[in-house]
Amino acid sequence: PDGKWHSFDLYTNRERVILHTAGEIMVDTRNPQWKWIPILRSNTGLVLLQDNGTPTNPQDDHVSYHNTWIDQNRKPITPSLIYAIAQDRFHTIWVGTSAGIFAIPSSVDFTRSNACKRVVIPRNDGSGLGDYLLDNEQINAIAVDGANRLWVGTATSGIYLLNPVGNIDDPTYTMETVAHFTTDNSIMPSNEVISIAIQKSTGEVFIGTGGGLVSYKSDATEPNSDFSEVYAYPNPVHPTYQGYITITGIMDATEVRILDSGGNLVRTLQGKGGTAVWDGKNAHGQRVASGVYTALCNTRTGKEHGVTKILIMN
C-alpha cells in the first residue's frame, strides 16, 4: 500500500542453482503465501516461493526448485521446458510442458513428494489400453473455466476443452474432450495458441494465437453461492428465436428441471458451473408449445432450491 517495489531472490541453496526468466506466476488457492513460478530458460522447472505472509521480508522466505516428477507408474518426468501452470477448483495443479501435460493432485504433499499424475485416455477398442492425455504435444497455455473444465492451448494443434471424469486420485480418472477448436472448424486465425484468459462471470474465453486474438462464448460460468439471482434469458422467447435459452445464477452441480404449466416434466438439464442451457425442446427433440415454463433448480444434495419462469411464444 505504500507504493514500494520489492524484489525476490530466486536463488535456492539446496540445488545450488540460480533461477531466472520467470513465466506467469500462479498464486496457490490453498495458501496465498505459496507462489508457483515456471522457469522458462536455464534450469527449467517450477519454483515454489513461500513468502511466509511477509513479502517485504525476504529473510523468512523459502524457495524450492522442482524439475523432476514421478508419475503413477513410477516413471520419471523431466520436461525440457515448462510453459504453463493452472489450478482447478479442487486445487489440482496442472502443468503444461514441451511434451504434454501432467497434474499434481491436492493430495500430494509437494514439500515432501515429487509425485504427479498423467491422465490416461482409454482407447475403448477392447484392448484395455490407453494413451496419455496430449502426449508429446507442446502445451503453451492452460485455463480453468467456471465448470472446472480445462482449456488447453497447444503450439500446433489449436485448443482443447477437456472435462474431468471422476476423482483424480482414482486409477480410473480420465478426461473427455468436449471440443477441439482449430483453423479447420472455427474462426481461429492460427493453430498456435499462446495464451488463454477466461471471464468466468460471463463464460467468455479469450484466446491469443500466433495470428491474433479471438474470443469464444462458452456455456459455463462461475457458480453462485446460492439461488438468489437465478434468471433466464432471452425471456420472453419470441417465435423467431432459434438459439439457446440460458438459465444463469445457479449453484455448482445443479440439476435444472423444466416443467410446463401443468407441472409435467419437459426436460432435465445439467448445469455447467453457474449456467444451464436449454434449446427450447422437450426430451423427444420437439420444440415446446407456447406457454409459461418453470425452471426448477436443485443442488445435488437437494438441500437448496431455486426457481425462475420462462415465457415461450411460438
Regions found by a protein language model. Give the residues of each.
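Conserved beta-propeller blade signature
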Residues: W34-P38, T92-V95, R149-G153, G203-G208
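Short coil-to-beta transitions that initiate beta-strands within beta-rich domains
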Residues: Y11-R30, T68-R89, P122-G146, H180-Q199, ...
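Short, glycine-anchored, charge-dense loop/turn motifs used at functional sites
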Residues: E255-V266, Y293
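Short loop/turn segments immediately following beta-strands, especially the blade-tip
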Residues: P1-W5, L49-Q59, P105-C116, N163-Y173, ...
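Short loop/turn segments immediately following the C-termini of beta-strands
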Residues: R30, P38-S42, S98, S106, ...
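Short, surface-exposed loop/turn motifs with a glycine/proline- and acidic-biased composition
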Residues: G271-K303
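Blade-level signature of beta-propeller repeat domains, shared across WD40, Kelch, NHL, RCC1
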Residues: N191-F227
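Glycine-centered coil/turn sites that cap beta-strands in beta-rich domains
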Residues: S225-R257, T275-W278
